[in-house]
Amino acid sequence: MADGSGGDDRPLIAVLDYGIGNLRSAQKALEHVGADARLTADKALIADAAGVVLPGVGAFGRCVEALGEAGLADVAHEAASVAADGTGRPVLGVCVGLQMLFDGSDENPEVPGLGVVPGRVHLLPEGVKRPQMQWNVLRWSGPTSMADGLEPDPWVYFVHSYWAQPDDPSYVAATCDYGIEVTAAVARGRMWATQFHPEKSAANGLRILENFVAETRAGVR
């Protein structure tokens, strides 16, 4: 389906299946907001999709390695890089999916990330509970279509011990307060990524996913 449609006006969204991540919950949440979401490692299907989701949970290094073992590292890098340029299809990274977009992580410093967002991932500081496993308030850094339809300062759900720090602060779409100002979301062009789990964030998370689906309906640029 080269038009990126699931066949019934629902945009086809490829959730990259490399054996690790919040796959089923992400798929169900996307379907709930009107997408035809497919868990897939099929490059032809991914190429036909109107949008791409890069999930991830667990250790940074293992996620990057598993993505490569599934033959999807180059696919994810190309899709996210093109999206960040404001062209191509929308891409959404979730949790470690956000972290993998960076150059690397202190969790596994020997493993390079995808290098789409210049910067590194760091351990949350001493003096705070690790992981952050709680609801927290998003503070938007500026206008973004990710926030369309949301009340100011929405609550979303986090589970993480590491946080991403872009070299260029303009990548930061939202932050949260957790002893320090933690990057909660990044955005550039048509590339979005969240440290929090939208699929676990009740109505606010579903709204963010709905906004992503709406972006996929705009087609390839």
For the regions a language model picked out, list residue spans one by one.
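Cysteine-nucleophile active-site neighborhood
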Residues: 58-134
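Extreme N-terminal starter segment of soluble prokaryotic enzymes
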Residues: 8-14
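Pocket-forming structural segment of enzyme catalytic cores
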Residues: 103-178
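An anion/phosphate-binding loop that grips the pyrophosphate of nucleotide cofactors and donors
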Residues: 49
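Beta-strand-turn-beta hairpins that frame and shape the catalytic cleft
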Residues: 153, 187-192
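Short, surface-exposed beta-strand/loop micro-motifs that present aromatic residues
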Residues: 181-187
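Acyltransferase
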Residues: 194-221
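Conserved beta-strand elements of the Class I
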Residues: 14-16, 92, 157
